[in-house]
From Swiss-Prot:
InterPro entries: MFS, MFS_dom, MFS_trans_sf
Keywords: Cell membrane, Glycoprotein, Membrane, Transmembrane, Transmembrane helix, Transport
Primary localization class, coarse: membrane
Official protein name in the record: MFS-type transporter ptmT
Originating species: Penicillium ochrochloron
PROSITE patterns: MFS
Biased composition (Basic and acidic residues): 561-570
Transmembrane found in the keyword field: yes
MF GO annotations: transmembrane transporter activity
Annotated SUPFAM superfamilies: MFS general substrate transporter
UniProt feature, compositional bias: Polar residues: 1-11
CDD domains noted in UniProt: MFS_Azr1_MDR_like
Topological relation to the membrane, as annotated: Multi-pass membrane protein
Family, similarity comment: Belongs to the major facilitator superfamily. TCR/Tet family.
């Protein structure tokens, strides 16, 4: 007897395309159903939760996304106090790197774990790891303990990133997910922007340890909500444990982790700790390249047991979203990082004031993100919104590249609003595209791939922007203020410039900073423009409203992968 608090799914002939359940080897040979996957809806007797449960679960997951977003940026204003307390200036970069490296290294692995094991319990275990890491960071008496805690939190966040999106696919049909996904993305975006402000408040008023204590009660609320209100769907247990373990691709993971760690270390250290020609950076890139090629060969060899099954990357929309995501998110990262630097260095405001001046971007993202979600729920198609998001983001970045020292509030408010609208249109859509395009059994891996690309974009474009900024700043200082040593500029930071330089050279220094920052926005313009090509690769008819009959699961009645793609317009 169905629970009265639940909503019955549509009839069998109206199931979402995202609820397909058949997987195939290359060439069309059939694989066993992956019926252990929570998101793999088997028949029309399965029920989605009722409205109250959907709201509670979404709010719980959104709170967790807020915590994860905070952890990405909250230490920006707290690190000086931490290094002073621990007397550990040499460890400073590891407070951020330990978290980022572990998160990026394990995101794809969690995509496979979510494929074979309960979404609910995998998410709760990931949340437990994140909370444990936060607790260690909050109470640690040493710098080493803080680094270990950050690494453990990073491992947990690797499961929370894709888990949040996968949970939404468990609690709502595809055509209702745009609004839920937008809400999750907005909470994460707000946390990313407000993180440095909260970090400064905690550090000045309480203690830097509250940057981590704050995660404990919020994560606790999420854990209670998910545990009580999210049900593990009934599925047939016909996948042997040995096959599940084998399907986690241990060989591929063992090669992928050192490959991605080498790449990220090269991107983080290059131009900062060492110059790009340093033998350490060159060797890291070589190691990353060689291991990356080995990993690709392993994926081809393992086929369906690979971390990313090759057939998944043969789908136009998956490839398109990856090509779209890297430059699009890269542009958002560059603008999000260097707009506050422009406010603080050129306009001379404090960190908290720069956060307030950054609100037009936040408001634009929230408003347009919600409005576009409602529109997508009505029209279904997403490709036009991807293109429009890229265009608006590129225009906004281009307008910001015209900033001058004399630029007034009308300019920086209006230009940021354009950036926010572009980000609101395109940031979360790739996650919906892959959910609408791939079979349900592939949703966890496809989701993890997109989120991994988002993380990778941050590392790549942060390194590019940092190189552009530092080189342009040094060149501008040599031209505009030849009496000033460029090294002292680079080592001194971007704040309190009026206190560090005499009045006769200060205008030249401010102009040099303005030139350096606006040149980084050129990289944002190029990135946003490139993302348009990815949007056009995505199939135009991928829709959150499109209903197709499920493929037959009996031998002789199933379609080959190529036939299925042809039917769906791939």
């Amino acid at each position: 007897m169905p629970d009265s608090g639940n909503i019955q799914l549509d009839t069998l002939q109206h199931k979402d395309h995202s609820q397909e359940t058949t997987s195939h080897y290359e060439g069309g040979s059939q694989l066993p159903e992956q019926e252990s996957l929570d998101t793999n809806i088997q028949d029309d007797s399965v029920e989605y939760p009722g409205l109250i449960r959907v709201i509670l679960i979404t709010m719980g997951v959104a709170l967790c996304s807020f915590c994860v977003g905070l952890d990405n940026t909250i230490l920006a204003t707290a690190i000086p106090k931490i290094t002073s307390e621990f007397n550990s200036l040499e460890d400073m970069s590891w407070y951020v790197s330990a978290y980022l490296l572990v998160t990026s290294a394990f995101i794809l692995s969690f995509g496979k774990i979510y494929t074979y094991y309960s979404v609910k319990w995998t998410y709760l275990i990931s949340l437990g790891l994140f909370e444990l890491g936060s607790l260690i960071c909050a109470i640690t008496p040493s710098s080493a303990g803080l680094i270990v805690g950050r690494a453990i939190s990073g491992l947990g966040s690797a499961g929370l990133f894709p888990g949040s999106v996968i949970i939404l696919s468990n609690i709502a049909p595809l055509h209702q997910r745009p609004l839920l996904t937008a809400f999750i993305g907005i909470m994460s975006g707000i946390a990313t922007v407000t993180g440095p402000i909260l970090g400064g408040v905690f550090t000045d008023r309480l203690s830097w340890r509250w940057c981590f204590y704050i995660n404990l009660p919020i994560g606790g609320v999420t854990a209670v909500v998910v545990f009580l209100f999210m049900k593990t769907m009934k599925v047939k247990k016909n996948v042997p444990t040995s096959q599940k373990i084998k399907g986690l691709d241990w060989i591929g993971t063992a090669v992928f982790i050192p490959a991605i760690v080498s790449l990220l270390l090269a991107l983080q250290w290059g131009g900062a700790r060492y110059n790009w020609q340093n033998v350490r950076i060159i060797m890291l890139f070589i190691i990353a390249g060689v291991l990356g090629m080995v990993w690709l060969l392993i994926q081809r060899w393992k086929k369906e047991e690979a971390t990313i099954p090759p057939r998944l990357m043969q789908r136009r929309s998956v490839v398109g979203t990856c090509i779209y995501t890297i430059p699009f998110v890269g542009c958002v990262i560059v603008l999000g990082y260097y707009l506050p630097i422009w406010f603080q260095s050129v306009k001379g405001v404090s960190a908290s004031q720069s956060g307030i001046m950054n609100l037009p971007t936040v408001v634009g993202t929230i408003v347009v993100g919600l409005l576009s979600s409602v529109l997508i729920m009505r029209v279904g198609y997403m490709m036009p919104f991807l293109v429009l998001g890229s265009v608006m983001l590129a225009v906004g970045a281009g307008l910001c590249s015209t900033f001058q020292r004399s630029s007034g509030s009308a300019e920086w408010i209006g230009y940021q609003a354009m950036i926010g609208m572009g980000a609101g249109l395109g940031y979360q859509l790739p996650l919906l595209v892959v959910q609408a395009d791939v079979p349900a059994a592939d949703v966890p891996v496809a989701t993890a791939v997109v989120i991994f690309m988002q993380n990778l974009a941050g590392s790549i474009f942060s390194a590019i922007a940092q190189t552009v900024f530092q080189n342009q700043l040094a060149n501008s200082v040599q031209i505009l203020a030849p009496s000033v040593n460029p090294e002292s500029i680079l080592d001194g930071g971007t704040v309190d410039l009026s206190d560090r330089f005499p009045s006769d050279v200060l205008p030249s220094i401010l102009q040099a900073y303005n030139t350096a920052v606006t040149h980084t926005f050129y990289a944002g313009v190029a990135a946003a423009s490139l993302s348009v090509f990815g949007a056009f690769i995505v199939r135009w008819n991928v829709s959150v409203k499109k209903k197709v009959p499920p493929e037959p699961l009996v031998p002789g009645g199933s379609h080959s992968g190529a036939e299925r793609d042809s039917k769906n317009g791939t």
